[in-house]
């Protein structure tokens, strides 16, 4: 069994996980669903030990994950099956750069026309405020958009 108690995680001033507590029974299939930007990917990465929560504990069969050795953590991860939402983003480019890239590669539009299209798309998918951020700095749901 996996037990999550009072899990919190923030990135800068943005609180992503706010006191999550739940349990997952061994052998059961569980779904983690929610709105875009609600912290699903961050939560799963905490479960896998890929991100360290700011507060709270994650226990596997009564053993606190953060107190386990690297080998034990690896073995636990191998027992879990995860399906992540995929994205084809360039980590070295900002959100704006990722949207601009196909236009630069496959259109003959002027720079200002391309920028107008990028601005339009970012507004449509509610990512204007994230335009200068890199994929690692935004939620999985935002990456999907």
Model features per residue range: what roles?
Residues 56-65:
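Conserved ABC transporter NBD signature motif
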Residues 65-81, 105, 111:
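ABC ATPase NBD coupling module
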Residues 92-101:
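Short coil-to-helix segment of the ABC ATPase nucleotide-binding domain corresponding to the Q-loop/switch region
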